[in-house]
Amino acid sequence: MALFRGMWSVLKALGRTGVEMCAGCGGRIPSSISLVCIPKCFSSMGSYPKKPMSSYLRFSTEQLPKFKAKHPDAKLSELVRKIAALWRELPEAEKKVYEADFKAEWKAYKEAVSKYKEQLTPSQLMGMEKEARQRRLKKKALVKRRELILLGKPKRPRSAYNIYVSESFQEAKDDSAQGKLKLVNEAWKNLSPEEKQAYIQLAKDDRIRYDNEMKSWEEQMAEVGRSDLIRRSVKRSGDISEH
C-alpha cells in the first residue's frame, strides 16, 4: 500500500508521462502545466461508488511490482518513467483492451452513482454536492499553487514576527510544536522595542526583495503570454508591458 501511495505522488509530480486520459471522465487533461488527474471518491457519505482507474493507471499498477522485482534498487520515479515508456510503446490493440475495460467500469460506476443518489434525501444530496464543490475548489487551488511554484513565483515577504518565529522556534524548550510556538509568542511579546526594531528592519528588507523579484517575474510572465498571473494593481499602473 505504501508503494502504491508513493506511485500516486510520483505520477502527480511527473505530470503527463503517458497519462492521456482522466480517470474521472475519460477525457484528455487540458492543463497548461500537465498534472495527472487523480480520482478521489466521496468518503463522508458512506459507501459512495469508487471511480475506476484509468487505462494507464491500471496498466501501471500491474507493471509496478514486476519492475520493482527486476530493479529492486531503483528509485520509484525511475520505475514510473520506465512504465510510462513501456505504455507509450504498447501496441494500440493492447491499449484498447485497457481502454475498453475502463469504459465498461466507468459505465457501471455511473449507474451505481445514479442508484446511490436515488437513496439520498434532498438534504443529503445537497450536502454531497456541497462537499464536491469544496473539493473541486481545493483541488483548483492546489493545482494553481503547484503551477506558480513551477513558474518560479517569488516567495511572499515575511513579517517581523514570522522572521522571529523562524529563528527562535527550534531553540524553544518544549517537546510539542504547539508548546514551542506558545513559548516563542510569549518571548516576542517580551522583546524590547529596540529588539523588535531589528526584525522590523529585516521585514522591510524582505519586502524590498519581494517587490524587486516580483517585478522581474511579472515581466517574464508578460513575455511568455501569462499576463493572467500579473497583479491587477501592476496592470493598472502600466508598469508591465503585455507585449
UniProtKB/Swiss-Prot annotation:
Gene Ontology annotations for the cellular component aspect, listed alphabetically: mitochondrial nucleoid; mitochondrion; nucleus; protein-containing complex
Organism field: Mus musculus
Modified residues (Phosphoserine): 54-55, 60, 159, 192
Swiss-Prot/TrEMBL domain comment: Binds DNA via its HMG boxes. When bound to the mitochondrial light strand promoter, bends DNA into a U-turn shape, each HMG box bending the DNA by 90 degrees.
UniProt keyword Transferase present: no
Protein name: Transcription factor A, mitochondrial
InterPro entries registered for this protein in UniProt: HMG_box_dom (IPR009071), HMG_box_dom_sf (IPR036910), HMGB (IPR050342)
Transit peptide start and end: 1-42
A Pfam family that the UniProt record links to this protein: HMG_box
Residues carrying Phosphothreonine: 121
Alphabetical UniProt keywords: Activator, DNA-binding, Mitochondrion, Mitochondrion nucleoid, Nucleus, Phosphoprotein, Repeat, Transcription, Transcription regulation, Transit peptide
SUPFAM superfamilies tied to this protein: HMG-box
